[in-house]
Regions:
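Bacterial N-terminal signal peptides that target proteins for export
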Residues: 1-11
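C-terminal motif of bacterial Sec signal peptides marking the signal peptidase cleavage site
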Residues: 20-23
Length: 240
């Protein structure tokens, strides 16, 4: 640090201390609405190493699971005025057109669809594009989410880190499958797909079965440079 910069830094520290002594709040004392420990992104890094580090346990019973346990579908957890489904469509489709409200996505193009590698034209109401949870809600329920708060389950169901626009028929063939039981037909997307699942499970501290971890290893061993995606929403949704 140069002498001039060192002087400026010391002056700034002195000013902050002076403000505190006079009863004023320093800048560091002001609340930062954009900052939250829960909002910290899942750290990037090797997806394969992260998969190795996931907790391994058996699948718990599905008893008590229903979609409503994860809140109403597609709520506005980030408080931007739009539901999560439309946020994801707007982010992942090209040539998007919206309703007059500025939120509802009426049409767009998914090119390529990650699950099939094909080009799909989206028109609202035609049901050719679904928003898929990379880690299915029922899978999460059986691997830790039963114990979560309602707010954490709502956050999980609406976290962009766990959501992808995809061909509807292919998505529905997946059901509640994990890596051991289902992979997208588009082999070029499998590394990214599995890395996404690993990142979500790491972020939300969900466990995996032994077969699931083995399948993750097998896919990611073919792309050892694959990194974890990061980001998404806080792990607790706002109180509605």
């Amino acid at each position: 640090m140069s002498p001039r910069n060192r002087f400026l830094a010391l002056a700034a520290l002195a000013l902050t201390g002076s403000l505190a002594l006079t009863g004023c709040e320093g800048l560091d004392d002001l609340p930062d609405p954009a900052r939250s420990d829960d909002a910290a992104p899942a750290p990037g890094g090797s997806a394969l190493e992260a998969a190795e580090g996931l907790t391994v346990k058996g699948r718990a019973p599905k008893t008590g699971y229903e979609r409503g346990e994860f809140g109403s579908a597609w709520i506005d957890t980030d408080r931007n005025g739009c539901g999560t489904r439309d946020d994801i469509l707007a982010d992942q489709l090209d040539d998007v057109s919206r309703d007059d409200d500025g939120c509802k996505v009426l049409s767009g193009v998914l090119d390529p669809d990650p699950y099939t590698g094909t080009r799909i034209t989206f028109e609202r109401g035609r049901s050719k594009v679904d928003i898929d949870h990379l880690v299915a809600l029922s899978d999460a329920w059986q691997k830790g989410a039963q114990k979560w708060s309602d707010g954490k389950r709502r956050a999980f169901a609406n976290d962009p880190l766990n959501l992808v626009a995809a061909d509807s028929s292919t998505n529905r063939s997946k059901g509640e499958g994990d890596t051991a039981t289902w992979l997208p037909p588009n082999k070029a997307y499998r590394c990214e797909y599995v890395a996404g699942q690993v990142s979500v499970k790491k972020k939300y501290e969900l466990w995996v079965t032994r077969a699931e971890q083995d399948a993750m290893r097998e896919v990611l061993a073919g792309c050892p440079e694959q990194k974890l995606p990061s980001g998404g929403n806080p792990t607790e949704a706002p109180t509605r």
